[in-house]
């Protein structure tokens, strides 16, 4: 039996990836379709993708597939042929090619079977995820962005919205998609007659969100086809003005793709204009936050002096301090003025709070 998971350390895998000479292309794709046996489908696809030396993160569920990967350029055509033939629903599936890419976005292939390909918290047997809103290509997105009877709704997390969004888009301020869905219904209840345009990074969240809004009685619901990534690609290819300002946050080593030259966020430590996310260098923290080059030097890549000091302790002392701390992703939320971890970060500057 072939080994259907990785057995090599992250450190070694990352070193191997960095030593590669063959360029890679970062790609994302998703598809809602019925998979009768997700585990068997996952194992077959793993064997196939491993032979093409694909790295990345793929979630598979009975409702479909969600993938963010990198593919060696010399294997790309073979990868596409294999993917398109893996299931009838995947034939000619749209592949979102990264807008900014150094090929170093992933260093290992991880494929997991989950209950849902995006955690939505929906527990309603009458909900039909196939009944989605109308797709919008870039030209129609721009036309609707200038329409006063249209509201754009960002279905991404608050830290994604913070560094880039469509002009005048409504933020649904939450850390999770499952929280955003009912919040969006409540926030838009008084403007049901307007055109509602949902968008997200690559389309997977806004497609399901559009179905959720229709399920709750909204009529004029749309979503941006292929999300921000495909919108930006189409707009630039067609010479259209960009209605998305700032940076598109991505969930890999790049942490962002520049869409426009606008920098709309601020350093969480000093308030300087900045939209570069990073993770705190303290192994016991890894807080996701925005840090400018000056603060990166001052705090040595840490989110606070506490983490800066802790990082310099002997490893055994660091492990003892970390013992008992909650694990999981920690995110600085400027809108709440809180740090969702056991550690501390100074309050953001006043001008950051005023945003």
From Swiss-Prot:
Biological processes per GO annotation: tRNA modification
Active-site feature positions: 200 (cysteine persulfide intermediate)
Family annotation (SUPFAM superfamilies): Rhodanese/Cell cycle control phosphatase (SSF52821)
Molecular functions per Gene Ontology: oxidoreductase activity, acting on paired donors, with incorporation or reduction of molecular oxygen
Keywords: Oxidoreductase, tRNA processing
Keyword Oxidoreductase on entry: yes
Reactions listed under catalytic activity: uridine(34) in tRNA + AH2 + O2 = 5-hydroxyuridine(34) in tRNA + A + H2O
The enzyme's E.C. designation: 1.14.-.-
Keyword flag ATP-binding: no
Domain Rhodanese per the UniProt entry, residue ranges: 146-240
Family, per entry: Belongs to the TrhO family.
Matches recorded under PANTHER family: TRNA URIDINE(34) HYDROXYLASE, UPF0176 PROTEIN YCEA
Role this protein plays: Catalyzes oxygen-dependent 5-hydroxyuridine (ho5U) modification at position 34 in tRNAs.
Name listed for the protein in its UniProt record: tRNA uridine(34) hydroxylase
Species assigned in the record: Pectobacterium atrosepticum (strain SCRI 1043 / ATCC BAA-672) (Erwinia carotovora subsp. atroseptica)
Phylogenetic classification of the source organism: Bacteria, Pseudomonadati, Pseudomonadota, Gammaproteobacteria, Enterobacterales
